[in-house]
C-alpha cells in the first residue's frame, strides 16, 4: 500500500530538533511520506543560543508549493510561517489542494524566546487559518493569544480558550498544557465542539524537550492521514510525544531535543482520557 503524503509548511531548525526537521522525522516514524515547503531558516548563536530567523524569498516559497501541490499531499501541517503573507498563502494552498486534513500549529515564538515573532501574525492566523483547520494545536501561550484571554492558569481557563478558538472556525482544538499546570502530570485539553477531554500522562524530564510542539502537531497530521479520527489522532500524538520527551537528550549546554524515534524504538506511554 502506498504511503500517505503529508506536507509541512514550516521553518528549518538548523539544530534539527524542531521545525521541518522534527516534522519529517515524525512523518517517517509514523509511516507517511513527508514533504516540505520551507518558509524560513532558524540559526542559533553558538555562545548564547539566541535565535536568528531568516525568511526565504516569496518566489522561492511559491516554487516549493508548486512542486508539493503537483505531488498531491493527503494532509497539510503548518509550523513557523513568519509573515502575514505566508500565513494567508498557507490557507490558500490547503484550499487549492486535495488534502483532506489541515493541521495548524500556531507557532508564535522560538523555544527559549519570550516575544511573539510578529504580533500581526496572530490576527492573520485567526482570519486565514483557523476557519480551515481540521485541528489546531496551540500551547498555553498560543491559546491565550488566539482566544484573547491572555495567560491561562487552569483547566477551566483552557476550556474557555478552546471554546473561543473553536468558535473562530477550528473544527477541533487541542491545547497543550504541558508542565505549566502541574509538576507531576502533563495535561492537555481536547475539544470537538461538544465535549471536553483531558489527556493526561506522567510528567517526565523537561530539560530536553526541544521540538515537542512541532512533533505533536506532526504526529497528529500523520495519524489523520493514516485514517484515525481527530480525537484518536491527538490521543495517539500525545503518547508519541510523551515517549519522545521522556527520552530527550542533551545536545549542548543550551538545548536538548526530544527523541523522535523513542515511541517505535524504546517504549509506548499510556494516556489517560477523561471527560471534564
Swiss-Prot record:
Q: Which domain of life is it from?
A: Bacteria
Q: Which NCBIfam families match?
A: HMP-P_kinase
Query: What's the top EC group for this one?
Result: transferase
Swiss-Prot/TrEMBL keywords: ATP-binding, Kinase, Magnesium, Metal-binding, Nucleotide-binding, Transferase
What the protein does comes down to: Phosphorylates B6 vitamers; functions in a salvage pathway. Uses pyridoxal, pyridoxine, and pyridoxamine as substrates.
**Pfam family example for this protein?**
Phos_pyr_kin
Q: Which GO terms describe its cellular component?
A: cytosol
Matching entries from InterPro entries are given as: HMP/HMP-P_kinase_dom, PM/HMP-P_kinase-1, Ribokinase-like
Q: Which amino acids does the record list as binding Mg(2+)?
A: 142
Q: What PANTHER family does this protein map onto?
A: PHOSPHOMETHYLPYRIMIDINE KINASE, PYRIDOXINE KINASE
**Which GO terms fall under biological process for this protein?**
thiamine biosynthetic process
* Covalent S-S links between cysteines: none
As recorded in UniProt, its EC number(s) are 2.7.1.35
Keyword Transferase appears in the UniProt entry: yes
Binding locations of ATP: 139, 176-180, 188, 213, 238
- Could you tell me which species this protein originates from? Staphylococcus aureus (strain COL)
The name under which this protein is listed is: Putative pyridoxine kinase
Alphabetized GO MF terms: ATP binding; hydroxymethylpyrimidine kinase activity; metal ion binding; phosphomethylpyrimidine kinase activity; pyridoxal kinase activity
The UniProt family comment states: Belongs to the ThiD family.
Catalysed transformations (reactions): pyridoxal + ATP = pyridoxal 5'-phosphate + ADP + H(+)
User: Could you confirm whether the keyword Metal-binding appears in this record?
Assistant: yes
Amino acid at each position: 500500500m502506498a504511503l500517505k503524503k503529508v506536507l509541512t509548511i514550516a521553518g528549518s531548525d538548523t539544530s534539527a530538533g524542531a521545525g521541518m526537521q522534527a516534522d519529517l522525522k515524525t512523518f517517517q516514524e509514523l509511516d507517511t511520506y513527508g514533504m516540505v515547503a520551507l518558509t524560513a531558516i532558524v540559526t542559533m548563536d553558538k555562545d548564547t543560543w539566541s535565535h536568528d530567523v531568516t525568511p526565504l524569498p516569496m518566489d522561492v516559497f511559491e516554487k516549493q508549493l508548486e512542486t508539493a501541490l503537483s505531488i498531491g499531499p493527503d494532509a497539510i501541517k503548518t509550523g513557523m510561517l513568519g509573515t502575514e503573507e505566508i500565513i494567508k498563502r498557507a490557507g490558500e494552498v490547503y484550499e487549492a489542494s486535495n488534502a483532506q486534513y489541515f493541521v495548524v500549529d500556531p507557532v508564535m515564538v522560538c523555544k527559549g524566546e519570550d516575544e511573539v515573532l510578529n504580533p500581526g501574525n496572530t490576527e492573520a492566523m485567526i482570519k486565514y487559518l483557523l476557519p480551515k483547520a481540521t485541528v489546531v494545536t496551540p500551547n498555553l501561550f498560543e491559546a491565550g493569544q488566539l482566544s484573547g484571554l491572555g495567560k491561562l492558569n487552569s483547566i477551566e481557563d483552557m476550556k474557555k480558550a478552546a471554546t473561543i478558538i473553536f468558535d473562530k472556525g477550528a473544527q477541533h482544538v487541542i491545547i497543550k498544557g504541558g508542565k505549566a499546570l502541574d509538576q507531576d502530570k502533563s495535561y492537555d485539553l481536547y475539544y470537538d465542539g461538544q465535549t471536553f477531554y483531558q489527556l493526561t500522562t506522567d510528567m517526565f524530564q523537561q530539560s530536553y524537550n526541544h521540538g515537542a510542539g512541532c512533533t505533536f502537531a506532526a504526529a497528529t497530521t500523520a495519524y489523520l492521514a493514516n485514517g484515525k479520527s481527530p480525537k484518536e489522532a491527538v490521543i495517539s500524538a500525545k503518547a508519541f510525544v510523551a515517549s519522545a520527551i521522556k527520552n530527550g537528550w542533551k545536545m549542548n549546554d543550551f538545548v536538548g531535543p526530544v527523541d523522535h524515534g523513542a515511541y517505535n524504538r524504546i517504549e509506548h506511554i499510556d494516556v489517560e482520557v477523561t471527560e471534564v
